[in-house]
From Swiss-Prot:
Protein name (record): Prokaryotic ubiquitin-like protein Pup
One Pfam family cited in the UniProt record for this chain: Pup
Compositionally biased spans, kind Low complexity: 1-18
Gene responsible for this protein: pup
Disordered: region residues: 1-42
Superkingdom: Bacteria
A single BP term in Gene Ontology: protein pupylation
Amino acid sequence: MATRDSGGQSQTGRSQQGEEIEDVTTEASPEVAERHAEITEDVDDLLDEIDSVLEENAEEFVRGYVQKGGE
């Protein structure tokens, strides 16, 4: 009788859920912290602009989005 070969490696039933992951904290340089603050502010401004457009005319925004190939 022929045996079936799975062709792959067998897996053991071991799980890594029990392993603890060590928390690592690093301090960013002042330049990195400043750049992070600038990017965060830019993103917040962009999100505020999107919110205002949606509050004013959400239907037109959605219609334009769908016409451009969005789902």
